[in-house]
Each structure stands twice: as structure tokens, then as C-alpha cells.
């Protein structure tokens, strides 16, 4: 498997425009990234442009705060899938996790898993920078119990991104059969290698092209 095949080529900034998305899509076709990860408003366009290419369409749910109701997250998910999404990255209810309301957290994740109805992968963003190690472990266990396919470190919109320590902890917690996605601040091939060595099976990055070319990405995009 090539380096590009594990990267979700990502554009999630609120001011991302149509031309930016079309450029992202063309780059994904050229380099054969695993997916493009875009906000829900761009899913239909991405699905149309990527049909038959083998590149998946990933979108975000309850993003970036995770503070939507479960019903809202489920609606977002169904809507995204109806428009062509094949992967969804949802944000957990972080406050409920911190309040030790594990049943609420698990039900929230399960609401998205059930909305997917087997038509898309579900990745669960736990926002590691806001959690203790115990909370990270608990979040991962709840995601697995709810039927998620992946756990993911970060939105890229909070106080920090992926670290090798968090990836190792998440991999140890979920075991070998669940995906672990590193996102937030992964900007070079060296960053990717570090995350993969720690246990990541997918990378979320806006610097995908620079990464596969072995170049240093310019700018300070947290994703």
C-alpha cells in the first residue's frame, strides 16, 4: 500500500471555496488518496467528480464541537450518505464523556453507526487534546462498543492535534481490528512515519500532496 493510500486529503476550513474543493479532488485523483475529507456542503460535488475513481468521499458530522444532539448527528449522517458520502468522521459528546455519562456517549456514537446502516465507514473523533489518558481510553472503548470502524485523534480545530503517544494509547486500547486515524498537525512524511509506527492506519491531512512528494508543507494549517 502506498503512502497516499492511507491519507484522507482534507479541506475543512469554513472559507474553503468551490475552486479549492475542485483542486482537492483533482489532487486526490492524481495521487490516489484514500479519500477527500470535506464539509457536508461539498459532499455531492465530490461524489459526482470522484465517481468511479476509487477515491472515497469522507465528511464530518457534529463538527467540530461534537455538541449537536444525537438526532442532529444522525440526520447529518443520513443526508451525507444520500449525497454520496462513503465515510463519516463524527465528533463525540466530549462533555458527556468528561461527566462520565458513558451511556450517553455510546448512544450518541451508535446513533451515527445506525444512521450509516452499513453504507459508510464511521470514524469517531475523540479530541485527544481535551482529554486525560483515562478519558481517551474510555472514549475508544465506547466507540468500539458502539460499532465504529475507526477512532480518530482530533478535529484540527481545538487546542492540539495528533501525538505519537496518543496514537499508541489508542491502538493499545482498541486492538488490531479497529482503525486509528491521526489528524491535526500531520504535515510531513516524517510525521506520517511517526504516526504509522505508533499504530495509525489512516492519516488526515491538508498537506497530502507535500507529504507524498516529501516536501515541507508551508503555512500553519492545524489540519
Swiss-Prot record:
| UniProt keyword Cytoplasm present | yes
User: What does the induction field say?
Assistant: Induced by deoxyadenosine and thymidine. Repressed by DeoR and glucose.
Segment forming the signal sequence: none
Catalytic positions are: 89, 152, 181
Subcellular localization(s) per the UniProt record: Cytoplasm
| Pathway where this protein functions | Carbohydrate degradation; 2-deoxy-D-ribose 1-phosphate degradation; D-glyceraldehyde 3-phosphate and acetaldehyde from 2-deoxy-alpha-D-ribose 1-phosphate: step 2/2
For this protein, the record's PANTHER family field holds: DEOXYRIBOSE-PHOSPHATE ALDOLASE
Biological function? Catalyzes a reversible aldol reaction between acetaldehyde and D-glyceraldehyde 3-phosphate to generate 2-deoxy-D-ribose 5-phosphate.
**Record-given protein name:** Deoxyribose-phosphate aldolase
Organism encoding this protein: Bacillus subtilis (strain 168)
